Design a protein with these regions (language model features):
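Amphipathic alpha-helical assembly/interaction segments
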Residues: 1-126
């Protein structure tokens, strides 16, 4: 049986594997939160679509980084994930300003995405 519940595996011999697994878990949790948010959006469908796609890109790029053997390519994947997470944060801000979603519903997702941006910035600089 696997030691983790993911189809994506992070090299256990890597000293940063635990952090990378943690950021992947955060990305999946964020994706779940986004799914809940987008289900409630009844207007501004372009923002709904952008938020959903960008949240998906975050998790996908972290997963792609897990499969890379090149340090430079891993960093690039983390940078792309960070940019997508930053896009998500901006869309959440726009939705809040335009009253597209209740602020209380956005707050947990925004907090999680900001933590993701920070972690991904750190991972992309290694």
């Amino acid at each position: 049986m696997d030691s983790h519940p993911f189809a994506v595996s992070f090299r256990e011999d890597n000293p940063h594997a635990k952090q990378r697994t943690g950021v992947y878990e955060q990305a999946l949790a964020f994706s779940e939160q986004v799914d809940t948010i987008v289900e409630t959006i009844t207007a501004r469908f372009h923002l709904k679509d952008l938020l959903d796609k960008s949240a998906t890109v975050v998790a996908l790029r972290i997963a792609q980084a897990a499969g890379e053997t090149s340090k430079a390519e891993r960093r690039r994947q983390y940078r792309v994930a960070r940019r997508a997470a930053t896009d998500c944060a901006a869309v959440l801000d726009i939705l809040a300003r335009r009253k597209g979603v209740e602020p209380g519903q956005i707050a947990p997702a925004r907090q999680l995405v900001m933590a993701l941006v920070s972690e991904l910035a750190h991972l992309s600089s290694r």
